[in-house]
Every structure is written in C-alpha cells, then in structure tokens.
Design a protein with these regions (language model features):
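Positively charged, amphipathic and often flexible ligand-engagement surfaces
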Residues: 1-308
Length: 308
C-alpha cells in the first residue's frame, strides 16, 4: 500500500526539500492549496460563497518548534478573521485549526495551545462564525478533546474532528453526539499503528458508517467529511431515517477534489462546506492529500511527468 509510504515521506526533511524544490510542484499544489496569503485567498472565498458553498479555512503549517511560531500561527488566523469581518463573510466561513500549530507539542504545550487558540475562537464568535479543532495523530487526541471541552464552556459552537480508523472513535462519537455539539467525521490521514487503528480500507469504511449512524441518531450536528460517493449516499439515507432536515447536518469536502459534487449537493439544498487551505508551509498537508486517495497521487505523478 502506498498510503503509509507517502505518510512516512510527509515527515521526511529530505523528501520535503526534493519536492518543494521541484519547479512543477507548486503548479500541482495549487489544485489543493489555492493561495499563500490572505489576499490571494479572498477571491476564492468570494467565488465559492457566490456559488452557494460555505467554507472552512485552514492556515497550513506544522512542526512548530518554538513558542514564537505558535504565536505567529495564532496571529495568522486572527488576520484571516479580520479580513472576513471586512468582507462581511463571517457567516460563510469557519476556521479549522490544528493544535500542533498552536504549540501543543512544546513543553507545557497543552496550556500553550489553549492560550493561543482561545483568542481565535473568541474572534471567530465575534463575527458570527466558529472554529473546529482538527484531529491529528492519536497521541494528541486526549489533549485536543480536553481543550475542546474547555472552549465549549464559553463557546459551545466550537467543533471537533473524529477519525473513523481509530478504535477509540466509536466511544468518542457516543460521548460527543449530544445537543449543541458539532462533529466532523473523517476517515483519518495519519500513519497509525495496528494497535490503535484499522489498517484496511474496508474496515475503515465499515467503521465510518457505524460512527456516522451514532452521530446521525444523536442530538448534535454531524459534519460528513468524505468524497466517497457510496458514503455520501449512506449519509443521506441515515439522515432521512433519523428524521433530520437538510440544515441539521452538512457535507464537507476538500478544495480541488470533486468540485462538481460540491455544486450538486448545494443545488439539492444540502449544506456543503469546502475545506480550503492556504499558506506557505504546504508540504505536510499536500502529502496527506496524496496518501488519502490513489487518484490524487496519480494526478500528481502525471502532472510531474507532463509539466516536467
């Protein structure tokens, strides 16, 4: 399987240098990451919003090693929120944040990440939107869920992400499927050991459906993070069986993947949110997109050969 190999490469400094230096790489990356600055991303926000789509914005970046970098990540999100306020687009775009960017892995990282993310959550609430805490590898999740619980005391609309491939996630879903919660379900995009995670696609797909049923039958707000046509159809059927209205759940897909499906679901009246990343530190994000789906890797390889 290529997925684990690609995920290993996402942590390789040598591979980072090789791919980042290739002239064609940036052209291909633009499919998934349409800009590096707030100014470059504003036309994308306007265009998607005009098409009836909502967004979740991710300022890409990982491997924070100093508190100053964590503070810079916080400030980047605050600048984005200020711009959304100016554009009066706060109700169309939420934020997705990785707590690793806010210093979670540093000494005293739990408290540091909470201190850095809280101003972002406060600023988002002030313009009528919210923040979702992304899930990262399994060793970070207890801290993420604790921060999520703490933030929800003052900002109950704060969301979180759960990953279907982890054995623990069904229990997490039961705990989170409560009134007022916002939970995004994804398959998972980190290399996890067999002791904690399913390793085969058919196992992950079955777990995804089991967990999605828990969320749909609960009283929270499920967010379906998938491009899989079969899982999308199953989600619609589970929502129907649970008696959910179209505004009581939403679909989320990545920018640059199945864009026609984004528009189709929105045209049918579904809430459709496009996960849109931007920034200069794109390597780790990009490599996980390749690992998630063989078609992404084929696209990248074909583009490298054609444009190189």
């Amino acid at each position: 399987m290529l997925g684990p190999v690609i995920l290993a490469a996402s942590r390789s400094d040598r591979m980072r240098r090789l791919i980042s230096a290739a002239p064609v790489s940036k052209q291909v990356v633009d499919r998934f990451i349409p800009g590096e600055t707030v100014d470059e991303i504003v036309p994308i926000i306007r265009d998607l919003s005009d098409r009836g789509l909502e967004l979740t914005m991710d300022v890409v970046g990982e491997d924070i090693t100093r508190p100053e970098q964590a503070a810079a990540a916080r400030d980047a999100y605050l600048a984005l929120i200020d711009r959304l306020k100016e554009l009066e687009l706060g109700d169309r775009a939420e934020m997705s944040v990785k707590l690793s960017m806010f210093g979670q892995a540093l000494d005293g990282g739990h408290e540091l990440a909470l201190a850095n993310v809280r101003p972002v959550v406060e600023a988002a609430a002030a313009i009528g939107t919210t923040v979702t805490l992304d899930a990262e590898d399994h060793t970070t999740l207890d801290s993420m869920f604790a921060i999520h619980e703490e933030l929800r005391k003052d900002f109950p609309q704060t969301g979180c992400v759960i990953q279907a491939y982890l054995f623990r996630t069904e229990a997490d879903a039961r705990r989170l499927a409560a009134a007022g919660s916002r939970v995004r379900l994804v398959k998972g995009a980190y290399k996890e050991p067999a002791e904690v995670a399913y390793q085969h696609k058919h196992e992950i797909d079955k777990a995804y459906v089991r967990i999605l049923r828990i969320l749909m039958e609960g009283t929270g707000y499920p967010m379906i993070g998938s491009h899989d046509p079969r899982l999308i159809s199953i989600a619609q059927e589970l929502a129907r069986r649970a008696g959910r209205k179209l505004d009581e759940y939403e679909f989320q897909m990545l920018y640059g993947i199945r864009s026609d499906e984004h528009l189709r679901l929105a045209a049918e009246g579904h809430r459709m949110r496009v996960y849109t990343a931007y920034g200069t530190d794109w390597y780790g994000y990009f490599m996980r997109r390749l690992a998630e789906k063989p078609a992404n890797l084929r696209f990248f390889a074909r583009s490298m050969l054609t444009r190189g």
